[in-house]
Amino acid sequence: MHAYLHCLSHSPLVGYVDPAQEVLDEVNGVIASARERIAAFSPELVVLFAPDHYNGFFYDVMPPFCLGVGATAIGDFGSAAGELPVPVELAEACAHAVMKSGIDLAVSYCMQVDHGFAQPLEFLLGGLDKVPVLPVFINGVATPLPGFQRTRMLGEAIGRFTSTLNKRVLFLGSGGLSHQPPVPELAKADAHMRDRLLGSGKDLPASERELRQQRVISAAEKFVEDQRTLHPLNPIWDNQFMTLLEQGRIQELDAVSNEELSAIAGKSTHEIKTWVAAFAAISTFGNWRSEGRYYRPIPEWIAGFGSLSARTEN
């Protein structure tokens, strides 16, 4: 069967700290075009690779990868909230297949996800509940982090499983590109934040969540004025990365260490491993070609903002 892929940056700052209207119109046009291509493909199953931002996964148990057999979006930063339509038996079968392939994939029957999962479903499909989805968490912020090689192998394992289903499969990768917003780190946290990172942050009081969101908004506003206030965006790296994906050279990323990536492009750039997993997955379907490449650094969203599609040719 055929597969389609779309990878898209996300940002909680959309609608809170937006770029100039002409930039916003440009991005919205890119997303609208991707949405049209996806609608024409008419997917029967979505595999969504996305990260978390200490809203669903914490240091009480922090897996490198987790498949949601059941999942609920919390609606942070005004993103969509509610249950994701996960086909339970299919998710269970996927987990077994991936484990048999040698990848230690965790599962959750009550996975809590944030805007990293919700935004691509909203922007590209029109809502959380439009198409059955297998939500796959890839740890992108909490050290120790999975590397490129293991993430690629995860994508390949999931791709091999879905290629046997006789369904039109849409692979989505959510996150990146270069960026380093103000995300807490366990090694530097005070007692209160440490407690939150160890798990109590899963059910934040509304007032504390609002303060947390306002800190991110304030950081973005300062970053627009002075891009020395956070790790700078890296358009050169971002474009080189997208070219590697387009040319089917993702295996070259295996040699890039987590420490090197953080130094080059920022500590939250590890979200790009969702793109790697998606491209690895579609590669198992046979020949494919990329389309719809777009990139622009957007300081207002603290992100090198990218969008890239691919489709199988068999």
From Swiss-Prot:
InterPro entries tied to this protein: DHPP/DHXA_dioxygenase, Xdiol_dOase_suB
UniProt catalytic activity: 3-(2,3-dihydroxyphenyl)propanoate + O2 = (2Z,4E)-2-hydroxy-6-oxonona-2,4-dienedioate + H(+); (2E)-3-(2,3-dihydroxyphenyl)prop-2-enoate + O2 = (2Z,4E,7E)-2-hydroxy-6-oxonona-2,4,7-trienedioate + H(+)
Active-site residues annotated for this sequence: 115 (proton donor), 179 (proton acceptor)
UniProt-listed GO biological process terms: 3-phenylpropionate catabolic process
A Pfam family annotated for this UniProt entry: LigB
The protein's role, per its UniProt record: Catalyzes the non-heme iron(II)-dependent oxidative cleavage of 2,3-dihydroxyphenylpropionic acid and 2,3-dihydroxicinnamic acid into 2-hydroxy-6-ketononadienedioate and 2-hydroxy-6-ketononatrienedioate, respectively.
The protein's assembly and partners: Homotetramer.
Protein name (database record): 2,3-dihydroxyphenylpropionate/2,3-dihydroxicinnamic acid 1,2-dioxygenase
Species for this entry: Escherichia coli O139:H28 (strain E24377A / ETEC)
